[in-house]
Amino acid sequence: IQDRLFTIGSSLAADPEKSKMKIPDLNTEDITLLEKEIDIMVSALPPLKSFVLPGGTLLNSHCHVARCVCRRAERLATGLSESEWVEPMVLIYLNRLSDYLFMLARHACFVRNITETPWRPRV
């Protein structure tokens, strides 16, 4: 994941028209790997019946913070794509990575027998 984030940074920082360097790229295998890992975690977890509040443990909280940062990066990259060329795989990868981080947070609670806190909206 860290290597792919550096790849994304290279892609977003470089001007493909002016760059003389070969820019690393993402490929479908990178996304497929995330999706496979998500599927493995989903198969072990109970289904969600409501939204869950972030938190529970330090690890779980870190996963949720990382997910929020990833979502923000996705929104910024999407906004950038409206005025500049952005490799489509970058947007797909960031979207799947945030899903992966959400499942990782849930999985971290599950393997430690920590009950997730459901969101109970005031209505």
PLM features per residue range, with description:
Residues 1-123:
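Phosphate/pyrophosphate-binding loop motifs in nucleotide- or prenyl diphosphate-using proteins
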